[in-house]
Regions:
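Low-complexity, polar/charged sequence tracts that form flexible coils or short amphipathic helices
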Residues: 164-167
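Conserved beta-strand elements of the Class I
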Residues: 170-173
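Ferredoxin-reductase
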Residues: 4-149
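Short, charged beta-turn/beta-strand-edge "cap" motif at the junction between a beta-strand
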Residues: 54-57, 157-162
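Structural and coupling elements of P-loop NTPases
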Residues: 153-155
Length: 173
């Protein structure tokens, strides 16, 4: 019997990463940038897993400042939309440590910085009540939205199997 373990399994590491920035780039999407202590060898199309500890996140404490390069004159560009959708009273409670996978939006040559684009996962809308259903919002997206520069998060990676083949053939997606 011959057992083969893919090489990428041995390249997976766990890191404490420092949050460099966490700006809204759209009403419900964050550009979450973290820095790891050493470079990670990964390919475009790879992903990481982020560890979400037990936590209680109040949406009213989230900072939804828009990206200063995209909207230099309007740091509160997305606040009105959050007000209109009444997101501020939402609360996410996580009772156990879990991990969630996120594709990396950064390019491997960017060194120790890893960028994720994360959409907030709200509860479903209840049209009859004209309010959010009474279910927990997304655990990982709420956790990521709550992070501020200087905070630390635990990640592992790189993971992935869906990469472009090196060839001269035409590629269709």
């Amino acid at each position: 019997m011959k057992i083969e373990v893919p090489e990428e399994v041995f390249g997976i590491k766990k890191w404490e990463a420092k949050v460099k920035s966490n700006y809204n780039v759209a009403s419900f999407i964050k550009e979450f940038v973290i820095e790891i202590p050493e470079e990670m060898d990964y390919k475009a199309g790879g992903y990481i897993q982020i560890e979400i500890p037990e936590c209680d996140i109040n949406y009213q404490d989230m900072d939804i400042t828009s990206h200063h390069k995209e909207h230099p004159d309007d740091p509160q560009k997305f606040k009105l939309e959050w007000d209109n959708f009444n997101l501020w009273p939402l609360n996410m409670k996580n009772n156990e440590t879990v991990e969630r996978a996120y594709s990396m939006a950064s390019y491997p040559a960017e060194g120790r910085e890893i960028m994720l684009n994360v959409r907030i996962a709200t509860p479903p809308w209840d049209g009859k009540k004209n309010d959010w259903m009474s279910v927990n919002p997304g655990v990982a997206s709420s956790y990521i939205f709550s992070k501020k520069p200087g905070d630390t998060v635990t990640i592992s990676g790189p993971y992935g199997e869906f990469f472009m083949n090196e060839s001269d053939s035409e590629m269709l997606y």
